[in-house]
Amino acid sequence: MAVSTGGADWRDGATAEQVAAVEHLYRNHRSLPYISPERDLAAWLEEVGVSSSKAVPKWALEPVADIELYGGYLLEVTAGDIILLWRISFDTFTTQSWFPKYFEYTYGIDAAFDLRMLVEAGLVEIESAADSLDLVTAPALCKALKDAGVNGLSGTKKADLMRLAREHLSPAQLEDTVPVRSYMLTTAGRALLDAHPGMVAKHPKKG
């Protein structure tokens, strides 16, 4: 997938020799993988010199699906995007979740940027504040409800606090109460993930 670094580019802090080394390393790949401007290029190039397995494999940059976005922009979905969909499928990925380094170093994608594109493509959606109440602690829910004039909450279970929050808090109050949101797959996102079981099977699993 095409990537954006918000104006920053890894080449800005690299020497001419390092740029040439990276371009030579990936000369037979479809495109250059994403490289964070914060990466220690000298150390990484030294690791690659010892073991080529430290480089992004050629297959990881090959598109597995093309999706047209608004304005005719073509979104090229690669293996890293499938793994990102897989991570989201566990329903534990939130707007505060961190992205493992393998997205950059193994799959060659800027995961944060790609996630925004997957949302724009309708493959992933950000849950509403009301649907993300499970991410809020019980004490925080109690405070929000008390601030809204709801009393008698002592000993109330979290599930009931969530229900009361949906019933008594205005949309604006919910927005303030739920700073973190969950990501979830849409039907299209689930279908795309299910169409590529081999990608998930190839991904290293802990344990």
Per-range role (PLM):
Residues 3-6, 10-207:
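Basic helix-extension-helix modules of the SAP/HeH family
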